[in-house]
Amino acid sequence: MWCSGFSVHCGLMSETIESQENQNEEAAVPAMTTVERAEMLLQQDAAIYAKINDGATLDEAVDPGNKEFGPLAHPEQVQMRVAKRAMMLKDGIQPYPVTLDVTATIEEVRAKYDGKLEAGDETEDVVGIAGRVLFLRNAGGLCFVQLSAGDGTKIQGMISKKEIGADSLKQFKQLVDLGDHLFIKGRVIASKTGELSVFAAEWAIAAKALQPLPALHKDLNEDTRTRKPYIGMIADEKIRNMVRNRSKAVASLRKTFADHDFLEVETPMLQTVHGGAAARPFTTHMNAFDLDLYLRIAPELFLKRCLVGGIDRVFEINRDFRNEGVDATHAPEFTMVEAYQAYGNYDTIGALVKQLVQDTAMDVFGSHKVTLLDGTEYDFGGEWKTISMYDSLSEALGEEIVPNGGPDNPGTSVGHLGEIADKLGVERDDVENHGKLVEHLWEHFYEDKLYEPTFVRDFPVETSPLVKGHRSKAGVVEKWDLYVRGFELATGYSELNDPVVQRERFVAQAKDALAGDEEACDIDEDFLEALGVGMPPAGGMGMGIDRLLIALTGATIRETITFPLVKPLN
């Protein structure tokens, strides 16, 4: 029942807006503060309202070239909608009513009546529904409107002169725009073409949209999607699905943790010492205490304090902040899950992470085998591969790389590792050691090539200051990283709980920091004191929620974050 002319109309509307914006950009734009511009827009709104109040028509209330208020004022399309809002207020109609008699969702009406009515069938069932107007068609004494619910479910509304009267129909045609939230109440019927519809006996604007929607039949550009995510949610089902799938994924993680008797806690975002991961922190200042603080890079040290306090299984899902680069798998603000299990180790926590990922795939997509955005399938089921960092690097280089086991067993020298890195063109750090070079060399050969789920085990001690030393391998710690589709998804440890060794590790990190390593962590004396009280042996894990969604869907990190951070245009 929908005519193709609506798509054309939406496209023309979008082009008009773009044209207006281009004209504004090309014109000489006066310097104006944010407050000044906001006040100017309010003055323009008031001027439009005054014209309407004095009896002007909608067209007469609009200033197409913005001659009065200049290029930074409302474009013509917005002015027209502001004028309609003014006309509603003049007529005593609330453009943003507090409540409406909504008796059913669009999805509920669809579920109850889809396939039950033949073309032309009418029921006496009256429903009150509301949704966003995506299409409008004027057929004289009958108007058709398509309403969309937040989940994308759509239904047709029919507004008839015979049912609501000539004045109400005229008002409908005059006031309702694409993008408005509209309430209609009436009987459920099937149109002559068989379209499930609500035949309106009454209607009301639930929220007047002053900003026009873009052309919904066109793909959104990346700039609009990231700068105006709310537009993306309206226009693109994939974006709405990502929001829902993310919520389902977090709910699944919480359920699996609950099944294993883990307790969820919240730890500080503002910290006096940055630690828990090797990363550059964001800094801030607390005026009340005249105290410099860090936005946390990880909750690890506080969660371990919970183990000291007797909470043997603990997890947190929350935000972390790292003042580093941005790419397809990294964002400065992201969501992490970290968990710690007393009397566990990196083997038991690895088994838990595997279950967490597999349960999430099952709960979100109904299978361990998921379909990515590019149409390919990825299987999280079955057994997962395990490799050793040192063994796999030795194999790739064709020579044995030996861990740094201390003064009596120094292993492969930093100088030799540096020569290999230079020969291969591997990027080197300003402050480097055996462990950093080993990891950089390993990443050169393997990082983006581990497609199937793979645990990479047994890391250099220098790069893992919070991890317990390996039970049988000097210079190595009991740590794994989980790689999926060529990127790191999660990490897990046998947690270091010896306060003397932990102090030694902190001192080594602090020396690196003094030498210029911005990712090295500080010495946290309060944490060392807590370890001195006694922390049981434990396994710990960390996994990015954003990265989990990347793994499950094939999206970029920006596509998994509902409101990603973007650099302002001005």
Where do the model's predicted regions map?
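Class II aminoacyl-tRNA synthetase catalytic cores and aaRS-like
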Residues: 9-570
